[in-house]
Amino acid sequence: MSQYFDNVDLKSNIEKYKTRIFDKEFCFNTDNGVFSKSKLDFGTRCLLENLPLEEIKGEILEVGCGYGVIPIILTRTVDKIDSFDAVDVNKRALHLAEMNKKENFSPKVNFFLSNCYQNINKKYDVIISNPPIRAGKNIVYEIVMNARNYLKEDGKLFIVINKDQGAKSLYKDLEKVYKCELINKKKGFWIIKCILRWQLVQSMLII
C-alpha cells in the first residue's frame, strides 16, 4: 500500500478534497504517492464511525497515519484526548499531514517519521491503525501484534481490516495475545477492539 513506502520519485501534484464526518467538515491536502488521495477511504470511515469515542482519551498513537486523517478528525471531535502521536514512513504523506494539521486547527497532533514502532519510546492509552495490507502480512502483524509493547497496562488497540484481506485469520491470531471484540462488520470491513491479556503476555516473556 502506497502510504507505507516512500514514493519521492513520483511527481508531486497536490490536490484537496473536503469530507464531512461527526457533523464537521474537514479539508485535506493530498498528493501522488499517498493512500486514498481523492477521498476519505471507506475502511477509515468505518473505523472512525464505529470507535467508542468515550474510550478514546489520554495519550493516543496511530501507526501508518498517511496524511493525517484519523488524528485530525479525532482531536477535533473528542475532548478527552491529551495528545495524539501519529507516525508513517512516507515523508510526502507526513509533509501533507503537517499542512492538514494547520489547515484543520489540530494542535494536539504530533506527526513524525517511524517505520512501525521504530521511533516510538513511550506507551499509550490507545493505539489505532488501518494497517497497510498491501505492504504485506509481516508489516500488518508487526503493527497489530507489537502494539502490546506500546500500550499502557489498561491500553486498547483499535484496527480495521477487510474480510477479503485476512480479517478472520488475523482475528484468531489476535485472540492469542489480546481479549478481542468485533465491534462491527460493514461491507466486509471488520472493526476490532483489542485489550491486553496481561497474564498471557507475562508468561510469553518468561518463556
Label the model's feature ranges.
Residues 185-207:
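Core SAM-dependent methyltransferase catalytic element
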Residues 1-22, 33:
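N-terminal auxiliary segments of SAM/dcSAM-dependent transferases
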Residues 141-153:
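A short glycine-rich, Lys/Arg-flanked "PGG" loop and its adjoining helix->strand segment in the class I
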